[in-house]
Amino acid sequence: MAIDENKQKALAAAMGQIEKQFGKGSIMRLGEDRSMDVETISTGSLSLDIALGAGGLPMGRIVEIYGPESSGKTTLTLQVIAAAQREGKTCAFIDAEHALDPVYARKLGVDIDNLLCSQPDTGEQALEICDALARSGAVDVIVVDSVAALTPKAEIEGEIGDSHMGLAARMMSQAMRKLAGNLKQSNTLLIFINQIRMKIGVMFGNPETTTGGNALKFYASVRLDIRRIGAVKEGDNVVGSETRVKVVKNKIAAPFKQAEFQILYGEGINFYGELVDLGVKEKLIEKAGAWYSYNGEKIGQGKANATTWLKENPATAKEIEKRVRELLLSNQNATPDFAVDDSEGVAETNEDF
């Protein structure tokens, strides 16, 4: 539809004035925006990357990962850091819980010598550090562990038993307004780990909620609900956890998908096991009886042996991964594998915990 010539001149003059006052790029036509194609970082899980629709977590955005205790929240974020470091990116870990284990992080592939770490005294200090790192433009991934541990200064300086209703929610709301723009400008990914609480007196529906008020729910581009759904056993020994992640919010692709994978103790996400399963599903890896083969070459009898073979042959594993991603990420409009029922999602509440 043609625009009146006088209107075009007026629009050009207005845009010129805005750019002169606020800088080049402060206003543009959406099709000219170079950042439309969202850059992503792998989560360390191939099935979760595919469930996210864009191939990983989006740069320049806020992501929330929540779930019960020992569900794999910190492990997942450490795998994201390891993946980012392999791409040469700089990462920071804001350890508000004062519980980061460097030995475990190293086992997951994190380069702890180049990982920035802070253990802030107050919630305000933690969020100011996040903002300073984002504004620097030199840090690519920031992880905050966790929102529940971001204690307002007034609460720390007060006495146990004092009422501080709404302080944490107000602190988070103010921080989100400040952080969102800075993260976009510096293309920094900020991941918040969050805990689950129970609302008192809920007779019907899901009593679960997350801490820190509602601001994070709104500002997050991606929200992941992670749960432990079973145990991985070798004989009688439990060697890991079966884990399910639901994408309950997604602003970069279709939401409401899910991924299931194994987290092995001391090793992290069983990436090569996922590769075998997805390779068979997409008919890239042939399975005849107990034998697995790729391009006519047998790679192992049983899934465990096939997984070991892929670990020992990273070039072939990379080739299979590339083909799986091309097949499954090319169809962005595919029907979600799983839709989160309203009764299952974590409820929102104005209560502050």
Swiss-Prot record:
Query: Which compartments is it annotated to reside in?
Result: Cytoplasm
List, in alphabetical order, the Gene Ontology terms for molecular function in this entry. ATP binding; ATP hydrolysis activity; ATP-dependent DNA damage sensor activity; damaged DNA binding; single-stranded DNA binding
A Gene Ontology BP annotation from the UniProt entry: SOS response
- Quote the SUPFAM superfamilies the UniProt record gives: P-loop containing nucleoside triphosphate hydrolases, RecA protein, C-terminal domain
**Record-listed ATP binding positions:** G67, P68, E69, S70, S71, G72, K73, T74
Q: What is its main location?
A: cytoplasm
Q: Name one GO cellular component term.
A: cytosol
- PROSITE patterns to which the protein is assigned, alphabetical: RECA_1, RECA_2, RECA_3
Record protein name field: Protein RecA
